[in-house]
């Protein structure tokens, strides 16, 4: 009997709580909706512009990010760019280390067992983290710089160029203090190093943005299969000629002791 009474009382408390929630729910939801609507009204888009500089096999990837004019607390924030490098390109980790020492860029490779000498068809995608810097010419802007290099591709039968697609990166932001406009852009949270020379892990906000270009396409010159016989013949001829000249020079000018 006592157990039945306790069950009835528990059910009554649950019904009372549900009724209270139904009574207060619409008002709270309306208040939250008004608050979100106010924040959305003052939202401005994040604009990302990604472009590739230079020609040939050695390029520079330049990423510029512009925030809205209404940002007052942007100086408390850091921007991290997570860039995927396609198999047709590679980033030299030793070059990145040299650029960090000279304070030119702050970037680090995430991928391990990375072979910079491998051709395109034996490579896989890699990942780079770039800590963007404030743009001195724009108050609400960040920019990042990354040198990339084209890998060798298989010869083509017709076209003498190969296309490499560089997709837009992920933008991650970490701020020392919260401010309402972050709700406009924050999509999810991602764990990443707080700084380049820091082993601490921070929870970065993955940001939504609008890109000027859908993606960047690089055209890389490649050989033609119709030239295979010619290239092999000339290479073999030059190799034999050079080897012969070296042997002649060794026997003519070399000093041998028995």
Swiss-Prot record:
Primary residence: endoplasmic reticulum
Source superkingdom: Eukaryota
Cytoplasmic side: 252-258
Family: Belongs to the PIGX family.
Transmembrane segments: 231-251
Range of residues in the leader sequence: 1-21
Organism: Homo sapiens (Human)
Pathways per UniProt: Glycolipid biosynthesis; glycosylphosphatidylinositol-anchor biosynthesis
Glycosylated position list: 103
Protein's UniProt name: GPI alpha-1,4-mannosyltransferase I, stabilizing subunit
Self-association and partners: Part of the glycosylphosphatidylinositol-mannosyltransferase I complex that is composed of PIGM and PIGX. Interacts with PIGM; PIGX stabilizes PIGM.
Residue ranges, Lumenal side: 22-230
Subcellular location: Endoplasmic reticulum membrane
Bilayer topology annotation: Single-pass type I membrane protein
Pfam families: PIG-X
């Amino acid at each position: 009997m006592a157990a039945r009474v306790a069950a009835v009382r528990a059910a009554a408390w649950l019904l009372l709580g549900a009724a209270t929630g139904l009574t207060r729910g619409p008002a709270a939801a309306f208040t939250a909706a008004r608050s979100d609507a106010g924040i959305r009204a003052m939202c401005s888009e994040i604009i990302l512009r990604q472009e590739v500089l230079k020609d040939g096999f050695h390029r520079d990837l330049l990423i510029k990010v512009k925030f809205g004019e209404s940002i007052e607390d942007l100086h408390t924030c850091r921007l991290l760019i997570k860039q995927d490098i396609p198999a047709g390109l590679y980033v030299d980790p030793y070059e990145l280390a040299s650029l960090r020492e000279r304070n030119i860029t702050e970037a680090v490779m995430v991928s391990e067992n990375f072979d910079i000498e491998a051709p395109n068809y034996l490579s896989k995608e890699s990942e780079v983290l770039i800590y963007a810097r404030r743009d001195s010419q724009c108050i609400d802007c960040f920019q990042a710089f990354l040198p990339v290099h084209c890998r060798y591709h298989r010869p083509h039968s017709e076209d003498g160029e190969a296309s490499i697609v560089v997709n837009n990166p992920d933008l991650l932001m970490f701020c020392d203090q919260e401010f309402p406009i972050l709700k406009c852009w924050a999509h999810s949270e991602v764990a990443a190093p707080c700084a380049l020379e820091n082993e601490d892990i921070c929870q970065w906000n993955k940001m939504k943005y609008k890109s000027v270009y859908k993606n960047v396409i690089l055209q890389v010159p490649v050989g033609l299969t119709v030239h295979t016989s010619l290239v092999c013949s000339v290479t073999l001829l030059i190799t034999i000629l050079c080897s012969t000249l070296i042997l002649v020079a060794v026997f003519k000018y070399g000093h041998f002791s028995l």
